């Protein structure tokens, strides 16, 4: 609870600026990273994320997706999916074999969204990097690992827009992954 409250305090409630879609996409393409703060169960937000990503892809943006929904131990399976060596059903089975609560299947979340992100990446040739440290670390240690992983992806993909899909409470406040990543 304190963790979430620190995010709320850091985010504040000030409205900064309103942008039309065209300007939002233009500005996004000029950045090193786009941070998509996630509410893991919010299907309307997820639909907006996917629409935004599709429009970025249509505008020619080359992206790399960094996903909290994927555990680092699952990176080889995700890579196999992205290259066509596994289909979605096999990928889901691989992830469930390691972790019954895989975000690709957990009904308490919005699993179709997380599957759609991977499908999007495959269709657009976008690399994916797992963010969730596995085995799962305590929150304070996990945020440092998340930030380091994002910084490493920036170095690995300097010519791509990083799209970071991460629970919003990690972004600011106690977790402060945005600042800690240096991206």
What does each model-found stretch correspond to?
Residues 1-183:
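Compositional signal for N-terminal targeting/processing segments
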